[in-house]
Amino acid sequence: AACCEKESLPVTPTSSDLQFGHLAKTWDEGIPLGNATVGTLVWQRDSVLRFSLDRTDLWDLRPMDSIAGPNNRFAWVCEQVRKGDYLPVQKKFDHPYNALPAPSKIPGAALEFPLNIGKVSSVHLFLNNALCEVLWENGTKLQTFVHADEPVGWFVFENLLDTVSPEIIAPRYSNPDEIAGDNSHAGPALGRLGYKQG
């Protein structure tokens, strides 16, 4: 949800708050907000403000033969390591996953704000309020948070000189160029699941 309130949301600073002089440039360093169901990372991708959105229940849970059966135990993996023969473990888990990475976490979407308002002067995560506040040198302020119990979040801009239209960005479900050279479980495995780009 978006708000256009004139007044700032109340915050209570603490000595444990996270404070930075700029927005993170990568998703994994973004300001985390969330609850047990939904979450977001607040960061800057290229020149846009980006909220990486996710849900804990977005999974591809199609059955995989490789993780079924009696050898689907950590004790079995440890036994192979003790024997000095890790190849059976790779054949059972890694090789099938490289072909079809399921079960797999599916990422949510992103919300991007194409703001041309200059340089960020501060980023503050108020831990007591679970609220992120971003200030720009021109006086623009963003406050955003995720509700503690409900699967919903809010953002409020103040002193925004022009209207801004956020854009919803779907995950890249298919990108053959990335898939061909990827051999990491954290990489673009989503493309190997066979979903059509929406």
Predicted features along the sequence, with ranges:
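C-terminal motif of bacterial Sec signal peptides marking the signal peptidase cleavage site
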Residues: 2-3
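Aromatic-residue-lined binding/catalytic grooves and analogous aromatic/hydrophobic interfacial grooves
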Residues: 8-198
